[in-house]
Swiss-Prot record:
Involved in calcium binding and microtubule stabilization. This is Translationally-controlled tumor protein homolog. The lineage of its organism: Eukaryota, Viridiplantae, Streptophyta, Embryophyta, Tracheophyta. Keywords: Calcium, Cytoplasm. The keyword Transport does not apply. The keyword Zinc does not apply.
Amino acid sequence: MLVYQDKLSGDELLSDSFPYRELENGVLWEVDGHWVVQGAVDVDIGANPSAEGGGEDEGVDDQAVKVVDIVDTFRLQEQPAFDKKQFIAYIKRYIKNLTAKLEGEELDAFKKNVESATKYLLSKLKDLQFFVGESMHDDGSVVFAYYREGAADPTFLYFAHGLKEVKC
């Protein structure tokens, strides 16, 4: 299994269990998230409550919770939305911090295509949700989420060059 860690914070943000598509010449990865139900385990122990005088489901009060699989798996923390000015300030700082960690062809590809990726994100800014890794590190990568038109499940966007592949 491969896990993708944030190069700046070390937080685990994604794994190969979630297939991705490259956007903007590979600068962004697009990953489909899914709403899943967590909790509310229905255990059939083979007893017949009506024969035993039991009432309607006197078992444990088990609460079902709907969560997004990627958010839950990697313990992503939702952040307040950015306005355009805040987003541009974040992107400038992020690019500066990330380029210090990149070398060679990876650095060249990032520098060449990050502007178009930034414009792509800016075009969706009003529809984006913002998530950071579990450590909530100020300079870490932000994971962006949005809902495609008519979609019930969110789509996540990652800066590919900000992820480090780690084998587990």
